[in-house]
Amino acid sequence: MTGLSMDGGGSPKGDVDPFYYDYETVRNGGLIFAGLAFIVGLLILLSRRFRCGGNKKRRQINEDEP
């Protein structure tokens, strides 16, 4: 009986701490979120539809004028 375990035969999931986080997965998810937020921010800044201030009324171009 020297090689037998006496831990009660519980399942391995019974001893898992519910507050244990896989920090590599959390870090990768955060980096993906930050990258997407950065790209969306650049698209908003570079887009002509979202202007900060400036003339709100667009000037129509008349093709008949020289």
Curated annotation (Swiss-Prot):
Localization (cell): Membrane
GO molecular-function term, one example from the UniProt record: protein-macromolecule adaptor activity
Keywords: Disease variant, Ion transport, Membrane, Potassium, Potassium transport, Primary hypomagnesemia, Sodium, Sodium transport, Sodium/potassium transport, Transmembrane, Transmembrane helix, Transport
Tissues expressing the protein: Expressed in the distal convoluted tubule in the kidney. Found on basolateral membranes of nephron epithelial cells.
BP terms from Gene Ontology: cellular hyperosmotic salinity response; establishment or maintenance of transmembrane electrochemical gradient; intracellular potassium ion homeostasis; intracellular sodium ion homeostasis; negative regulation of cell population proliferation; positive regulation of sodium ion export across plasma membrane; potassium ion import across plasma membrane; proton transmembrane transport
Entry coiled-coil feature ranges: none
One Pfam family, short name: ATP1G1_PLM_MAT8
Main location: membrane
Membrane-topology descriptor: Single-pass type III membrane protein
The keyword Amino-acid biosynthesis belongs to this UniProt entry's keyword annotation: no
GO cellular component: basolateral plasma membrane; extracellular exosome; plasma membrane; sodium:potassium-exchanging ATPase complex
Entry's disease: Hypomagnesemia 2: A disorder due to primary renal wasting of magnesium. Plasma levels of other electrolytes are normal. The only abnormality found, in addition to low magnesium levels, is lowered renal excretion of calcium resulting in hypocalciuria.
Subunit details: Regulatory subunit of the sodium/potassium-transporting ATPase which is composed of a catalytic alpha subunit, an auxiliary non-catalytic beta subunit and an additional regulatory subunit.
Known role: May be involved in forming the receptor site for cardiac glycoside binding or may modulate the transport function of the sodium ATPase.
Name by which UniProt lists this protein: Sodium/potassium-transporting ATPase subunit gamma
